[in-house]
């Protein structure tokens, strides 16, 4: 089976992706502050190898404040205040999962280590400017990533929150995989159906039904 190194390596041969990476590099060299740091842009793939993927959570673009983004969607580094969307994710987990205690941090690496690919659809952003890298080619790259998961894996649970993530649903074969959709957890839309969606318990029910080990969502509580 291919690895993420294979997938990313073959995309780096494509003209569109060469242009994406060159633009990001030249912005950094020109002194613009770009998040996450260059060494962490592909963090999601380092922590969750292709043959380990059981769940995919799709975000949009990285957090654009200092010390927040580290390459995993919705996650922030330890010691950084939990952002509002993640506060709502925790709120739904507390409602959905017995004994879930809201953590005092937003560091989600322990989910990634269990097979939850925490993927933004755009992997870089300029400081203080949301969506500033939305049209650099990252979307094409993450389309390829989803196509690869669709083709290589079986029984993956995709959590698609908000219209942006749901658009990516067109690449997913629903006879091989599971798709759970809800409004985005941001404060603007969480109360339109994200709170109450039950996606975390439902993900584990679907994994268990296929003989796969469930995700210990509580791993962030410890």
From Swiss-Prot:
Superkingdom of origin: Bacteria
Cellular location(s): Cytoplasm
Any GO BP: base-excision repair, AP site formation via deaminated base removal
SUPFAM superfamilies referenced in this protein's UniProt entry, alphabetically: Uracil-DNA glycosylase-like
Major location category of this protein: cytoplasm
GO cellular component, one term: cytoplasm
Catalytic activity, reaction form: Hydrolyzes single-stranded DNA or mismatched double-stranded DNA and polynucleotides, releasing free uracil
SMART domains xref list: UDG, UreE_C
Active site: 61 (proton acceptor)
InterPro entries given in the database record: UDG_fam1 (IPR002043), Ura-DNA_Glyclase_AS (IPR018085), Uracil-DNA_glycosylase-like (IPR005122), Uracil-DNA_glycosylase-like_sf (IPR036895)
Keyword field: Cytoplasm, DNA damage, DNA repair, Hydrolase
EC number: 3.2.2.27
Keyword hit for DNA damage: yes
Entries under Pfam families matching the protein: UDG
Record GO terms (molecular function): uracil DNA N-glycosylase activity
Family: Belongs to the uracil-DNA glycosylase (UDG) superfamily. UNG family.
Function: Excises uracil residues from the DNA which can arise as a result of misincorporation of dUMP residues by DNA polymerase or due to deamination of cytosine.
Protein name according to UniProt: Uracil-DNA glycosylase
Organism: Aeromonas salmonicida (strain A449)
């Amino acid at each position: 089976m291919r690895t993420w190194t294979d997938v990313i390596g073959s995309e780096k041969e494509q003209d569109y992706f060469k242009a994406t990476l060159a633009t990001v590099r030249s912005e950094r060299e020109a002194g613009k502050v770009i998040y996450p740091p260059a060494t962490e842009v592909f963090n999601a793939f380092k922590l969750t190898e292709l043959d380990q993927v059981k769940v995919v959570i799709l975000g949009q673009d990285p957090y654009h404040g200092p010390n927040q983004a580290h390459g995993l969607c919705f996650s922030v580094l330890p010691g950084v205040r939990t952002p509002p969307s993640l506060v709502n994710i925790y709120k739904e987990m507390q409602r959905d999962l017995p004994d879930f205690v809201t953590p005092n941090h937003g560091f989600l690496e322990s989910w990634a280590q269990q097979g939850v690919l925490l993927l933004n659809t755009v992997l870089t952003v300029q400081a203080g400017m949301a969506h500033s890298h939305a049209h650099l080619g990252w979307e094409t790259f993450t389309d390829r990533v989803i196509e690869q998961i669709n083709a290589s894996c079986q029984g993956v649970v995709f959590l698609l929150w908000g219209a942006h993530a749901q658009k990516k649903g067109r690449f997913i074969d629903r006879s091989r995989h599971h798709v759970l959709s809800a409004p985005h957890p941001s404060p603007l839309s969480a109360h339109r159906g994200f709170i109450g969606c039950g996606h975390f318990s439902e993900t584990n029910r679907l994994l268990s039904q296929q003989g796969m080990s469930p995700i210990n969502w509580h791993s962030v509580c410890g």
